């Protein structure tokens, strides 16, 4: 065997050995990876919750008819009720319940769910969802009583408006979700870095940024109108009702009335037969009102400084919570009204029978480019379940115009003769300047604006008018100043002729003689 042959055999052996070694290492790595994947799969299977079949117990099934009587709507005079929500549609006649249960992907027969005789094609998650929806009938009825069937629904709005104001009333809570002033435009940059200005109708409140509700609390229940879906009814062009129909024939809701040409919408709580639903021990209702106040002007600083939460004690002057920073306060006396004031526009709640007390809060939103403040109030009012209209609130939503705010005392009747003093929402300066503004400046400005559309021209004419009024008082001053200008060269000559401190007396005598 020569040297070359030996070298070739050795190289071939090394190559075979290396291939076998590499193949063995790869098999070992694959085996380890498979073991790791199997371990992870076992762990994931152990961590994954096991879906078990749920079902309605006999006790729960027996309680359903009573729950439908409590939370459903009675049909006729017999033992006939319906209980309809987006998840269940049930009907009961003489204790026999029929209907359907809606899940995410199908509709099931109520009695099939109760008896657990669903098709094998129905998945476990669908079965459990149907059981959950039926159980909600029991839990909602225990918590909300006759209000239970109104817990769920499809959100929507109904419109109400006149030539000044356009309103959208949400059926979810029965409150005014949007209020638009038709005669006024906002003046905002298109974006933070743009010089372009976008104009749009001013919105006093907008969806997601303004909400109010009423809360009734007894020893066993806490009912908040924000939890329910109301049924809207357009009574007329100026009246809308949002109602909840009860099982025993009772009714609860709100009536909104917006007269033509007015910035004031009247909100009345309407009810019938509620003394059988709300315990007689419930003697007050809590108004919960929150608002993120949006910007309307390009200049944020001045708008923020002139926006805030205002209120008026009965028999006292209006006050505010403080224009800057985070402020809270407990108002323990009777209140005539509570208002959220923007620089040029306001929304004010004015109850007919006053608020008995309130807790108020204000927070600056300096980091939010679209809003200036977050305002909140919780105000208590007298309530009686036996009255047809236990609560009436007039809601002003409009511009801070002195003549308009002053006229609201005549437009809004009250339980007492105490003035609203809503004109105090307008900053008119110290008392003496306030008198001048209210007695002279504002009447003249209002008169000129009736036939002159340019505010610049009005301000120019108003300046001339003020100059004419002040002329008799300033004439002598102007005359004295003119004489001094004429005598100035001669006085200078006297000063030059008699210089020095030793000639001071002589200079004074010569000047007086002149």
Ranges and model annotations:
Residues 1-4:
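Positively charged n-region of N-terminal signal peptides that target proteins for export
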Residues 8-20:
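Hydrophobic membrane-insertion alpha-helices, especially the h-region
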Residues 27-42, 480-491:
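Alpha-helical transmembrane signal-anchor/signal-peptide segments
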Residues 56-421:
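Soluble non-transmembrane domains of integral membrane proteins
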Residues 367, 398-455:
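Interfacial loop/helix-cap signal at membrane boundaries in integral membrane proteins
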Residues 469-514:
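Membrane-interface amphipathic helices and adjacent TM-edge segments
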């Amino acid at each position: 065997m020569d040297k070359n042959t030996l070298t070739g055999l050795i190289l071939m052996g090394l190559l075979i050995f290396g291939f076998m070694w590499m193949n063995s290492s790869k098999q070992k790595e694959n085996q380890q990876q498979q073991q790791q994947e199997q371990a992870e799969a076992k762990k994931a299977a152990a961590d994954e919750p096991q879906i078990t079949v749920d079902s309605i117990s006999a006790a729960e099934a027996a309680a359903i008819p009573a729950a439908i009587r409590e939370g459903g709507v009675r049909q006729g005079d017999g033992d006939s009720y319906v209980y309809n929500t987006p998840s269940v549609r049930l009907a009961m006649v003489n204790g026999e319940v029929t209907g359907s249960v809606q899940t995410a992907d199908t509709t099931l027969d109520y009695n099939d769910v109760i008896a657990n005789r669903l098709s094998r094609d129905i998945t476990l998650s669908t079965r459990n969802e149907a059981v959950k929806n039926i159980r909600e009938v029991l839990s909602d009825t225990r918590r909300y009583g006759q209000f239970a069937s109104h817990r769920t629904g499809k959100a929507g709005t109904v419109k109400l408006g006149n030539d000044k104001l356009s309103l959208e009333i949400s059926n979810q809570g029965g409150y005014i979700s949007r209020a638009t002033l038709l005669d006024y435009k906002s003046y905002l940059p298109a974006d933070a870095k743009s010089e372009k200005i976008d104009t749009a109708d001013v919105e006093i409140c907008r969806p997601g940024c303004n909400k109010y509700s009423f809360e009734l609390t007894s020893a066993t229940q806490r009912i908040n109108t924000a939890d329910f879906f109301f049924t809207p009814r357009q009574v007329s062009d100026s009246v809308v009702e949002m109602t909840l129909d009860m099982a025993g024939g009772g009714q609860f809701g709100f009536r909104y009335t917006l007269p033509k040409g007015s910035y004031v919408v009247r909100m009345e709580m309407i009810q019938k037969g509620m003394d059988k639903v709300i315990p007689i021990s419930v003697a007050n209702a809590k108004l919960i009102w929150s608002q993120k106040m949006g910007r309307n002007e390009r200049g944020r600083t001045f708008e923020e400084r002139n926006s805030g939460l205002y209120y008026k004690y009965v028999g006292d002057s209006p006050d505010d919570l403080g224009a800057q920073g985070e402020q809270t306060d407990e108002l323990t006396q009777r209140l005539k009204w509570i208002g959220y004031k923007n620089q040029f526009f306001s929304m004010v709640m004015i109850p007919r029978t006053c608020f008995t007390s309130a807790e108020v809060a204000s927070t600056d939103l300096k980091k939010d480019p679209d809003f200036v403040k977050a305002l909140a109030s919780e105000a208590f009012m007298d309530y009686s379940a036996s009255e047809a209209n236990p609560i009436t609130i007039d809601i002003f939503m409009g511009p801070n115009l002195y003549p308009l705010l002053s006229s609201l005392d005549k437009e809004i009747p009250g339980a007492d003769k105490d003035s609203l003093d809503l004109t105090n929402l307008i900053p008119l300066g110290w008392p003496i300047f306030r008198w001048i503004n209210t007695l002279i400046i504002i009447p003249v400005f209002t008169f000129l604006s009736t036939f002159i559309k340019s505010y610049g021209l009005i301000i120019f004419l108003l300046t001339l008018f003020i100059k004419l009024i002040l002329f008799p008082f300033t004439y002598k001053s102007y005359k004295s100043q003119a004489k001094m200008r004429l005598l100035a060269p001669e006085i200078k000559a006297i000063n030059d002729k008699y210089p020095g401190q030793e000639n001071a007396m002589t200079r004074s005598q010569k000047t007086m003689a002149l």
